[in-house]
Amino acid sequence: MRLSQVSVLAACVPAAMARFVELMEANNVVLGPDEPAFLIETAPGKTQWVTEEQKWELRRDGQRFMDVTATQDLGSQGLRIKESVEFPKKCVNQKEVNSLAKHLDTAPMKANLEKLSSFHTRYYNSDWGLKSSDWVLKKVNEIIKEAGADKTVTAQSFPHTWKQHSVIATIPGQTNSTIIIGAHQDSINLWLPILAAPGADDDGSGTVTIMEVFRALLKSKDVVGGKAINTIEFHWYSAEEGGLLGSQAIFQQYEKQQRDVKAMLQQDMTGYIKGTLDADLPESVGVIVDYVHAGLTKFIKTVIEQYCAIPWVETKCGYACSDHASASKAGYPSAFVIESSFDKSDPNIHTTSDLIEYLSFDHMLQHGHMTLGFVHELGFHNFAKTVEGESEL
């Protein structure tokens, strides 16, 4: 934010401003310069230079974007989003998935979300954001150790040039072909990054949902023992709210390394159903159908029909609305499932009111069933035997 605006505010409310400055200094919150230092992409190929303040102004106005300042070469390796092999037309691992699903539990999800949302904010360039990502890494490692999987399964920090790091857990398979489950761990108060941002739904809910799926999946001896055909990764991204910064950095690296990512599923906001119920509509999950991979999205609908007790609805969220966009830009098939149709999703996000009390853990459990089915079915799917098809976006 500009110092001139700060000084005006200070003249009006000196006590409040003094407290603001105290918090800024005590927690090392870093804001960007006043000059246009950030290159953002608001649509495919449409870019503009903005200041840090202008980034948040755009977000407050509902504009989503990718901050491509450090990732202008993302997608430059010549990868094309493709269906080089067809995704399964039906689910085949019902016995194994249903057995593992019995381990999914709302109690750990609630305990983990209470802890995650207790951080004053998880703003990616603050000490709070660093501490919250440290907690995520610690918790994931605890899950691995409790499962007795620490000889094969790993969790590592993916550092960035800002304070908060991303976290990647890897379950090796028989091949390097990889299935990725993602959520973003950061939160933001769009009025000012220093203000409280519990981020219970956005995206604390997705963070703990995939954490619980990870815990349940490690109950499988075959998975832990490396018998899945494909490698499985769980990603907790930093700095989604700043323009998909963390996920772009990761997929930029994967693209340069020519990693073979077969599918990426994003879980961003999995707990709010009040908007749907208030509209007298049935509880459902929202399957995003714009800027996603059509074949993978079709498969997700099949997974929901097989493993969830509620239906899906198609919905749209626009360009760069979550981290799946980074995978897509790198040339990898990606998809996104949200808590409801987009227009019925949580109105409390990016404020101090994004609280646990407004969320349904039973609904989050449905997202867990879907994610578990998705990752197990594709983890054990032999892509080498499927038929080549056409790309559709």
Curated annotation (Swiss-Prot):
Which GO BP annotation is one of this protein's? proteolysis
Q: Does the entry annotate any disulfide bonds, and if so which pairs?
A: C317-C321
Q: Where in the cell is it found?
A: Secreted
**What residue range is the signal peptide?**
1-18
Q: Provide an example Pfam family for this protein.
A: Peptidase_M28
Q: Does the keyword Protease apply?
A: yes
Q: Which residues are glycosylated?
A: N176
Q: Which GO terms describe its molecular function?
A: aminopeptidase activity; metal ion binding; metalloexopeptidase activity
Which positions does UniProt annotate for Zn(2+) 2 binding? D202, E241, H350
The free-text note explaining how the cofactor binds reads:
Binds 2 Zn(2+) ions per subunit.
Where Zn(2+) 1 binds, per the record, is at H184, D202, D268
Q: Which residues form the propeptide?
A: 19-84
Keyword Glycoprotein included in the entry's annotation: yes
Protein task: Extracellular aminopeptidase that allows assimilation of proteinaceous substrates.
PANTHER family to which the protein is assigned, alphabetical: AMINOPEPTIDASE YDR415C-RELATED, METALLOPEPTIDASE M28 FAMILY MEMBER
Q: What is this protein called?
A: Leucine aminopeptidase 1
Name the gene: LAP1
